[in-house]
């Protein structure tokens, strides 16, 4: 029995579950979405909260430019470019015989400085918020000070009295670990069995304590939570429920709007924006989607992408069970090459807060991620890790979803003028030998097609 029903009963009441359990690539577009003006109230956070996070990141920019020289050229602002993907677009259009396809772009968070993934947004913001709270309370700084003061030996000695803990499949651990250690904190990163060895090695090289767990993501998070509960000076970054992570991700939207302006890309009712966000536990894509809805309203359509073996958010929202269920409850193994998305139980906070704001969800097979990685690398010259490719098939899924397009009332002209944005969540820091192994796998899969 699964939550009081047999699997057969679930498949009858929720037919898509049969496809999920069979590990088939699946799409589901939520008929229950609402207008942004109404549904944004579900979140419990506001535009003012996002502005506060944005202002905090600017206060810390001089500090970041000082301690991370790779951010100096951008003045300590951690941001990524928007890059066209003409070859991937051509492949998707040909494969799907797509009409009125619009343009395809990459938001290259894979190239973000410091930790090379989307987690450099939320993770670094939350660590900086905690550091700021402690430093203000201790009188080390005032809000109007130059925060480069925090690069001093005195500040590092102060922060070294405190510990930060987090559970992660990899990328969040990298961003939390590197940032916390740079400030002077003691750091423990609890890593799930899915975490790549190079990510653990990089953390240890930065002076971070890595605690390895033989179980999956949810266990790693729980271990981090328990560590913090037993130590009053230990702060736990809760990837499943953190508003500060969420707000750090949300800041991306106002910056994206400026990049679109500079590139001459319009976003309005006649020029819709579709954004494809790889989803693990949900904090990163949820936060970005919240920011996008605040900035672009009903002109933006956010779609979450998950591995066929880890469809936790789709399952949670579709059944209405949210974090009360896991993919394992339904016999799905949560084992995927998309290590950053290997999450069996979704964030209840994100699922409930965002369910009326996310247009749809789809799953993608590992083999497809590898195949697309080769095209992205060889033809569009972008380096993305497997998880980051999950957003690429999104344009195909949306434009083949006739019922969804009809329900939304899109005209051929609107679709022709649409912008499709793949959120490239990570990849630049993958070691060359590991990346070449991925490419070899992708090429062998191409050869067998």
UniProtKB/Swiss-Prot annotation:
It catalyses: D-serine = pyruvate + NH4(+). InterPro entries: D_Ser_am_lyase, Ser/Thr_Dehydratase, Ser/Thr_deHydtase_PyrdxlP-BS, TrpB-like_PALP, TrpB-like_PALP_sf. Its cofactor is pyridoxal 5'-phosphate. SUPFAM superfamilies: Tryptophan synthase beta subunit-like PLP-dependent enzymes. The keyword Lyase applies. GO terms for molecular function: D-serine ammonia-lyase activity; hydro-lyase activity; pyridoxal phosphate binding. Keywords: Lyase, Pyridoxal phosphate. PROSITE patterns: DEHYDRATASE_SER_THR. The keyword Lyase applies. Its EC number is 4.3.1.18. Signal peptide: none annotated. Pfam families: PALP (PF00291). GO terms for biological process: D-serine catabolic process; isoleucine biosynthetic process. The modification N6-(pyridoxal phosphate)lysine is found at residue 119. Belongs to the serine/threonine dehydratase family. DsdA subfamily. This is Probable D-serine dehydratase. The gene is dsdA.
């Amino acid at each position: 029995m699964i939550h009081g029903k047999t699997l057969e009963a679930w498949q009858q009441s929720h037919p898509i579950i049969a496809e999920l359990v069979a590990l088939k690539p699946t799409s589901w577009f939520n008929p229950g979405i609402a207008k942004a003006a109404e549904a944004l109230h579900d979140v419990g956070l506001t535009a003012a909260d996002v502005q506060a996070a944005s202002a905090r990141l600017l206060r810390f920019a001089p500090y970041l430019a000082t301690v991370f020289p790779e951010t100096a050229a951008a003045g300590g602002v951690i941001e990524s470019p928007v890059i066209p993907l003409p070859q991937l677009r051509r492949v998707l259009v040909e494969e799907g015989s797509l009409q009125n396809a619009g343009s395809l772009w990459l938001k290259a968070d894979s190239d973000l400085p410091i930790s090379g993934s989307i987690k450099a947004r939320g993770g670094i913001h939350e660590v900086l918020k905690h550091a700021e709270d402690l430093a203000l309370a201790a009188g080390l700084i005032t809000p109007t000070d130059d925060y480069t003061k925090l690069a001093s030996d005195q500040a590092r000695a102060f922060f070294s009295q405190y510990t930060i803990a987090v559970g992660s499949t990899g990328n969040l651990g990298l961003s939390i670990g590197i940032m916390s250690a740079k400030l002077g904190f003691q750091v423990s990163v609890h890593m799930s069995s899915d975490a790549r060895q190079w990510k653990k090695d990089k953390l240890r090289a930065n002076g971070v304590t890595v605690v390895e767990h033989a179980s999956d993501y949810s266990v790693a998070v729980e271990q981090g939570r328990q560590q913090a509960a037993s130590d009053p000076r230990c702060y736990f970054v809760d990837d499943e429920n953190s508003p500060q992570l969420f707000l750090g991700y949300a800041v991306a939207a106002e910056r994206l709007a400026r990049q679109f302006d500079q590139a001459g890309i319009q976003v309005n009712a006649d020029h819709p924006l579709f954004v494809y966000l790889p989803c693990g536990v949900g904090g990163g894509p949820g936060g970005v989607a919240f920011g996008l809805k605040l900035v672009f309203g009903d002109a933006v359509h956010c779609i979450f992408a998950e591995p066929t073996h880890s469809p936790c958010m789709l399952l949670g929202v579709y059944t209405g069970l949210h974090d009360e269920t896991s993919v394992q409850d339904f016999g799905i193994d949560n084992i995927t090459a998309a290590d950053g998305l290997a999450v069996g139980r979704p964030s209840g906070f994100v699922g409930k807060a965002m369910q009326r704001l996310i247009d749809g969800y789809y799953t993608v097979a590992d083999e497809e991620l590898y195949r697309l990685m080769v095209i992205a690398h060889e033809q569009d010259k972008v380096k993305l890790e497997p998880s980051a490719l999950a957003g690429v098939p999104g344009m195909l899924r949306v434009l083949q979803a006739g019922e969804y397009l009809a329900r939304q009332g899109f005209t051929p002209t609107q679709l022709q003028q649409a912008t499709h944005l793949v959120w490239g969540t990570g990849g630049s820091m993958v070691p060359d030998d590991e990346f070449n192994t991925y490419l070899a796998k992708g090429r062998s899969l191409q050869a067998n097609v």
